[in-house]
Amino acid sequence: MQPSHQSVIKVEQLSKTYGKGENAVMAIKACSFEIFKGETVALLGPSGSGKTTLITMIGCITEPTQGKLYLDGELIFDQHWRISDTRKLRRQKIGFIFQSHNLIPFLNVEENITLVPLMNKTNPKEATLKAKELLDYLGVGNKLTAMPSQLSGGQSQRVAIARSLANNPKIILADEPTAALDGERALSVMQLLKKLATEQDVAILVVTHDERMIPLFDRIIRVNDGFVTEDIQQMS
């Protein structure tokens, strides 16, 4: 399945400034791009280039200073207005994968995966069934009752991926998801994310500095000094 032309994320002249007056620092500078359903996009750039700031704005964690941000065709921020309940929006439409997995240590795998769906008022039986299906799909179906401390690094990341899919998101935002993994495991996780975009029809935006992963993405967006310097569509 090829990426569609259905817009999931659209940013228009998005900027972020920290501080005021002489101490103001502009971390993101008038960035514009669009991400579509079923598309895998890499956000590349050196440390301090603005990648994390950009992804936290897209994830409705950090509020932009200027510009417009659309999610699934809905305007959720401009400099004069923003959607009131960003937490609910995150729970319903965005999945997150972090470098450190961020699994809750005192909850087992099933409880970690079903937490957000249950917050969204999903039927508990349906949430558990979805968790089982995702774990089977990701090759860790026997870990449903395991505690995070009992998982290997690769297993933890697969559970984190399952958790990101549990609320049927429109987009998954992944911040350096393979940084803690060795080369072979990192490649395996990235191939899995590519497969998910196609088979689950979800957009995936990955912050990474690993140039070896570039061939796996549909598009490469490069950021440097707060600017989008390149937006390249790759040949499939």
Question: For the regions a protein language model found, what residue spans apply to each?
Answer:
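Conserved switch/coupling elements of ABC/ABC-like ATPase nucleotide-binding domains
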Residues: 75, 225-233
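ABC-family P-loop ATPase nucleotide-binding domain
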Residues: 1-17, 230-236
